[in-house]
Structures are given as structure tokens and as C-alpha cells.
Design a protein with these regions (language model features):
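N-terminal leader/linker segments that initiate helical-solenoid repeat arrays
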Residues: 3-57, 62-72, 82-83, 106, ...
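Generic helix N-cap/helix-start motif at coil->alpha-helix transitions
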Residues: 12-20, 31-32, 47-54, 81-89, ...
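Residue-level recognition of tetratricopeptide repeat
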Residues: 25, 59, 93, 127, ...
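Repeat-based scaffolding regions
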Residues: 28-32, 51-52, 169, 224-225, ...
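Structural motif corresponding to the intra-repeat A-B loop/turn of tetratricopeptide repeats
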Residues: 30, 64, 98, 132-133, ...
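Alpha-helical repeat scaffolds
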Residues: 67-79, 101-113, 134-148, 168-180, ...
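Alpha-helical adaptor scaffolds
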Residues: 127, 248, 320-321, 423-481
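Terminal, low-structured helical/coil segments at or just beyond the last alpha-helical repeat
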Residues: 230, 234-246, 487, 499-540
Length: 540
């Protein structure tokens, strides 16, 4: 059994399990997941009974996509009752891969007893029955405390199972219900349903799922119209693929909350274990890995989906994000340009390009991309967010007059959107223009979103620069309480406190701001903390 050395100076055999484990821990801390994975694999082989090695190996293996190591680690943890709840899902995936239907059913029973993922049981059992060759539709007990949660996932699987059984009328009804309930991954779901319908002769119904003049669907529409590649995209889902669809959807759903992002990655990885050729799990995993800081793995996952295929555009979009997260910004921008240049490119492609260009300080290019994204909308129905993006790029690119016109248009279209009101109001305050109207915009924004520290700061700073110090100080104190690590807010508070005669507190606020400030701002804060407030030291 692996144990820590008795003394800090004790030598460790470079070939030992302990050495491999320590190397893995160091690699974990240094952000070298590949080395960490190899080290934990070696450590577990050298000491297969070590719970600590198994625990770290399990998490690293699932995140990294090594199913064999994940299953070995899970077996060690299970023997001591330490297997994480998602480990049961992993073991179900393993049983489905082996076509061990009785074993899969026993594991589902355990999943129900454990509680966390019990709501997945009716649909999972139904897919197991598909594998057994004696199909039984999912049955959700209305008295079950998880019934409402399980029903969120039901229609999608009823549709796939009806398609498998050739029951097109019931499949179409379930498809319509499933699409009506979904808010994410809509394009991928439309594609898989369209492929299934087209392969069963429902060509018109398949095409109806794929909007015209959208690049994401161009290849699929062309193939369906010509009858090409339908056997590939219309294969009936297996038990494992059905389970993978369930986990992929759950991974996407729970990962809107950053606190559950790592669990979402593990679920998407398990889905890919049981359906390695399915594109959706790889696309979702790429997205979640990128957002969680695992850019190298995200790139690998996105590239698992063939670029020329039906799902290629969706995977390439995630590849852009992963490349940017990995610091490969030139490559990301090049790919984003290529995706935005195709016929009928969706607005999202232009927005993605614009955001990357803005991050590289190419504000004119960014504004142009955001403007192009608006082209497909009627003039009075352009989404306010696209106008805000364009206005922000123009403002940062020193084209204030054009920016103001765009931002004012956004405010007319979205008069109760606090983000728009805040940007337009604060930009005018910064330039000391239209001050009274700008303060009113910020008051309205703050009333609409009183808990937003950034908006509270904007209003407090506007009150300060217009001379209402008595109103400004408590407003800025509230902003700083809500965002204590924000350098701009703390500097604003310090300036206002100084003007109110509260010099000690002002210096305290400036010191708090200096902790997070850089460059010119850090120099300015140091100067006024040392010398006191002077006109040339005023916050920008």
C-alpha cells in the first residue's frame, strides 16, 4: 500500500509507485495533465490497492478520456466504498459496452439506491431493454420525487426509440415536444433527428427540421435532398448510444452553473466512452473542457469530429474557442474567419470572430464583424446585444461619435436593458458629455439591476463627477462591498472618500485597488496613496 515517506529527506526509488504518484501530483499542480495521467497510470500499476492513487487516477482518467484507467481506478475505490456517484454511471457505460445487460440492470438498481442520478433510471432501463431485444418503453412513476426531472429528458428518448421501431407518427410528435423543451444543443439535436427521419423515408419532415440559409445545416440539407449518406446518419441508436445521449444532455444542462462544470465534463467523457463515434458527446466535452481551462483536451475532442461532416461546423466552432483558450489566437482567428466567410454564415460565427478581434485590439475589424452579424435581421429587430457589441468596439477603437449613435439605437430597441443603459451612460460620463441625461440612464440601469456592482459603481462615479459627493460615497461603498477585488471600483471609492474629507479611508481604498491594478493604474494609485489626491491623479 502506498504511504508517504516517514521523513522529508528520505530517498524515493525513481521506479516506485510512490515516485510515480508524486510526479503525477506535481504535474497536476503544474498544469501538465498528460504527464499527470501517465504518472497515475504507472502508480496504480505499481500499487493497485492504493486508495489515494486510485482516487486521483479516477478523476484524471475521466477528465483525460482514458476509460480503461478510469474503470480500474473505480474498481479500487468501489472496494472500499469510496467510488464517486458518477462512477456508477461509468460502470454502467462499461457494462453496456460489454453488452452485459444483467450487470447493467444491477448497476442501475445501485444508482437508484445512491439517489444522485436516480432520475435517469427509467430511461436507462428502457435502453437496456433495447439491448436485450425485448423493448420496454420508459415508465416514470408520477409519485416519484424525481418524476418532473426525469420527464425533462423523456421525449427525446421516446423519439429515438419510436424511430428505431419505425413508428414515424409517434416519433414526430415526440421530436416536436423534445425540440420545444430544449434551449441548448438545438442544432445537434435537429441534425440527429433529421438524419433518422430521412433514412426512414420522411425526407420532407427531415428537411423541415433544418432551417434553410443556415450554414450549420447546409451539408445535411444537401445530403438529404440527394439521398446521400443517409444510412450513416440514420442508424438506429443502440443501448449504449441512447445512454450516451442521456448523459450528454445532462452534462450540458448542469454545466450552466460553473460550480458543476467538472461533473459536466465527467458526464460528457463517460458518454464518449460508451459512444466514441458519436459527435455530440465530443462537441459538448470540447465546450466544457475549454471553459474549465483544459484547452489541450478540448482541442483534441473538437478534432474528433470530422470537419467536412454534418456536425463539422459545430465542432469547428468549439475548436475556435479551444484554440483561443490555449493561447493559439492567430490560429483561432484564422479558423473563425474561415467559418464566417462561408455562404449563409450564422450571426454567431461573425460574433465569435468579432470577439476574438476585439480581444486582440482590432476594434475596427471587430466592429465590422459585429455589423455583419446584424445583416440578417430587419432594421427594427436587430438584437440589442449585437448593437452593444458593435458600439463597444467602436468606442474602444476611438470612434466615439459612431459608437454613440449605435449605442443610442440599442437603447431605443432595449430601453429596459440595464447593460445597454450602463454602457451608454458611463461612456458619456467618461467624456463629460450629456451629463444630466447620462446620470438618468445610470439611475434607471441601477434601479433595474440594483445588485450589479459594476452598474452601482457607474452611477456612484457619475454622481461624483457631477458634484453630488454625498450621494456618490454610499453608492460607491455599496459597489465596493459587492466587488471587493475590483480595482476600478476601489479607486473610484477612494477618490470620492478623499473629496468627502475621509482621507484615511481613501488611502485604504486606494491600497485595496492597488492589489489588483497593473501598469499606469498601479502607478497612479501608488502616487496618490503616497502624496494624496492631485488633479493629475484622478481616476480615468
Amino acid at each position: 500500500m502506498l504511504v508517504l515517506p516517514a521523513a522529508a529527506g528520505a530517498s524515493v526509488d525513481p521506479g516506485s509507485a510512490l515516485h510515480a504518484y508524486m510526479r503525477g501530483r506535481l504535474a497536476d499542480g503544474d498544469g501538465a495533465p498528460g504527464l499527470a495521467l501517465n504518472s497515475y497510470r504507472e502508480a496504480l500499476a505499481g500499487d493497485p490497492a492504493s486508495l489515494e492513487v486510485a482516487r486521483r487516477s479516477y478523476f484524471q482518467a475521466v477528465i483525460s478520456g482514458d476509460m480503461a484507467l478510469a474503470l480500474r481506478s473505480a474498481a479500487v475505490l468501489e472496494s472500499d466504498g469510496l467510488l464517486p456517484r458518477d462512477g456508477t454511471l461509468l460502470q454502467i457505460a462499461g457494462a453496456l459496452n460489454r453488452k452485459d445487460w444483467p450487470g447493467a440492470r444491477l448497476l442501475v438498481d445501485r444508482m437508484v439506491a445512491e439517489g444522485n442520478f436516480a432520475f435517469l433510471a427509467p430511461i436507462t432501463r428502457s435502453w437496456i431493454s433495447v439491448g436485450e431485444g425485448r423493448y420496454a418503453p420508459p415508465v416514470i412513476d408520477p409519485a416519484d420525487r424525481f418524476a418532473s426531472l426525469a420527464r425533462r429528458y423523456l421525449d427525446e428518448h421516446l423519439a429515438f426509440q419510436a424511430l428505431r421501431n419505425g413508428d414515424l407518427p409517434n416519433a414526430q410528435s415526440a421530436i416536436n415536444r423534445a425540440l420545444a423543451l430544449r434551449t441548448g444543443e438545438m442544432d445537434a439535436l435537429r441534425l440527429i433527428f433529421a438524419g433518422q427521419l430521412a433514412a426512414r423515408g420522411a425526407k420532407a419532415e427531415a428537411l423541415a427540421l433544418l432551417p434553410e440559409k443556415e450554414a450549420n445545416f447546409a451539408q445535411a440539407r444537401a445530403d438529404i435532398a440527394s439521398g446521400k449518406a443517409l444510412s450513416l446518419h440514420g442508424k438506429a441508436l443502440t443501448a449504449g448510444q441512447g445512454f450516451a445521449r442521456l448523459l450528454t444532455r445532462l452534462a450540458s444542462d448542469i454545466s450552466s452553473d460553473g460550480s458543476t462544470g467538472t461533473l459536466g465534463i465527467r458526464l460528457a467523457r463517460i458518454a464518449a466512452f460508451v459512444d466514441p463515434d458519436g459527435p455530440t458527446a465530443h462537441i459538448v466535452a470540447a465546450d466544457l473542457l475549454s471553459r474549465a481551462g483544459h484547452a489541450a483536451y478540448a482541442i483534441e475532442e473538437a478534432r474528433m469530429v470530422p470537419a467536412p461532416g454534418w456536425y463539422g461546423a459545430l465542432a469547428q466552432a468549439e475548436l475556435v474557442e479551444a484554440l483561443a483558450a490555449a493561447g493559439k489566437r492567430a490560429e483561432a482567428i484564422g479558423l473563425a474567419r474561415a467559418l464566417a466567410a462561408v455562404p449563409d454564415a450564422e450571426p454567431e460565427r461573425h460574433v465569435r470572430l468579432g470577439q476574438l478581434l476585439a480581444q486582440e485590439k482590432d476594434f475596427e475589424g471587430a466592429a465590422s464583424a459585429f455589423r455583419t452579424a446584424q445583416a440578417g435581421y430587419p432594421a427594427d429587430a436587430v438584437p440589442w446585444a449585437l448593437l452593444l457589441f458593435e458600439g463597444s468596439a467602436l468606442e474602444q477603437g476611438a470612434h466615439w461619435n459612431e459608437a454613440r449613435a449605435v449605442l443610442e439605437r440599442a437603447a431605443r430597441l432595449a430601453p429596459n436593458e440595464p447593460t445597454v443603459l450602463n454602457y451608454l451612460g458611463y461612456a458619456q460620463i467618461e467624456r463629460r458629455q450629456n451629463m444630466d441625461a447620462a446620470v438618468e440612464l445610470l439611475k434607471k440601469a441601477s434601479a433595474l439591476k440594483p445588485q450589479d456592482s459594476s452598474i452601482t459603481d457607474s452611477l456612484g462615479w457619475a454622481q461624483f463627477v457631477t458634484g453630488d459627493i454625498d450621494a456618490a460615497v454610499p453608492m460607491l461603498e455599496r459597489a465596493a462591498a459587492g466587488a471587493p477585488a475590483d480595482a476600478t471600483i476601489n479607486e473610484h471609492l477612494g477618490d470620492a472618500l478623499w473629496a468627502a474629507g475621509r482621507r484615511y479611508e481613501a488611502r485604504y481604498a486606494w491600497r485595496a485597488a492597488a492589489v489588483f491594478a497593473e501598469g499606469e493604474t498601479a502607478q497612479r494609485l501608488a502616487a496618490k496613496t503616497r502624496e494624496g489626491m492631485k488633479p493629475e491623479y484622478a481616476a480615468r
